[in-house]
């Protein structure tokens, strides 16, 4: 993802690492007092993003997290050989309950 703008401090980008790495990142942000965080993923990592939110919501902070919004979409990605393909994306916004 070179050439993109820097990610905001309340965003967790889900990729190829184990799910617990992203769970820890989300919990760290929530414990630092960030009011709302966004979990973003695309392609095959979408299921990891959903797993991340569910683990935070059910195992670590039960009854303390609410899902604010879920956005799905697609991006056009150009491969190294010049072909374009669409990749699905997801953004899940969560926050601590008041």
Swiss-Prot record:
Gene this chain is encoded by: albA
Organism whose genome encodes this protein: Metallosphaera sedula (strain ATCC 51363 / DSM 5348 / JCM 9185 / NBRC 15509 / TH2)
Keywords per UniProt: Acetylation, Chromosome, Cytoplasm, DNA condensation, DNA-binding
Entry GO CC: chromosome; cytoplasm
Stored NCBIfam families: DNA-binding protein Alba, PRK04015.1
One term of GO molecular function: double-stranded DNA binding
Modified how: Acetylated. Acetylation at Lys-16 decreases DNA-binding affinity.
Main location: cytoplasm
Protein name (record): DNA/RNA-binding protein Alba
Annotated GO biological process: chromosome condensation
Primary role: Binds double-stranded DNA tightly but without sequence specificity. Involved in DNA compaction.
SUPFAM superfamilies (alphabetical): AlbA-like
Subcellular location: Cytoplasm; Chromosome
Family: Belongs to the histone-like Alba family.
Modified positions (N6-acetyllysine) in chain numbering: 16
The keyword Transferase appears for this protein: no
InterPro entries reported for this sequence: Alba-like_dom_sf, DNA/RNA-bd_Alba, DNA/RNA-bd_Alba-like
């Amino acid at each position: 993802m070179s050439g993109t703008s820097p990610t905001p401090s309340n965003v967790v980008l889900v990729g190829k690492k184990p799910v617990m790495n992203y769970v820890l990142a989300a919990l760290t942000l929530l414990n630092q007092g960030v009011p709302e965080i966004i979990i973003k993923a695309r392609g095959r990592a979408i299921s990891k993003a959903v797993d991340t939110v569910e683990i935070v919501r059910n195992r670590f902070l039960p009854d303390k997290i609410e899902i604010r919004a879920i956005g799905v979409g697609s991006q056009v990605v150009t491969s190294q050989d010049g072909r374009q393909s669409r990749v699905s994306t997801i953004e899940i916004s969560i926050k601590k309950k008041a």
